[in-house]
Amino acid sequence: MHNFRKLVIWTRSIDLVTRIYQLTNTFPSHERFGLISQMQRAAVSIPTNIAEGSAKTSNKDFARFLEISIGSSLELETELIITLNLKYIDSMIFEDIQNEIIKLQKMITVFKNKLE
């Protein structure tokens, strides 16, 4: 069992959640039940699954939850692309957050591979 609070992948994903909430607060109000909700849920799913997986007694089970976290990060990345296409964000913000997501995906993948 791992202490999720000490995992860099968890702390970085918590930072990403904060950033996504701040970003989506700038979106049009008509997106409240659309992209805003979807992006926030995808972002929250990343650290939540890391934390839940850390309680599992086997590394195989933990790795499965890390795969779910990676899937949520890919969902978030897709939604970020949509927000760029809709011009809710500019390309600089997009690139900055996308790079953050990609770094996190790589970190989670490396950690998962070490468990297996």
Q: Where in the sequence are the language-model features?
A:
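Amphipathic alpha-helical assembly/interaction segments
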Residues: 1-116
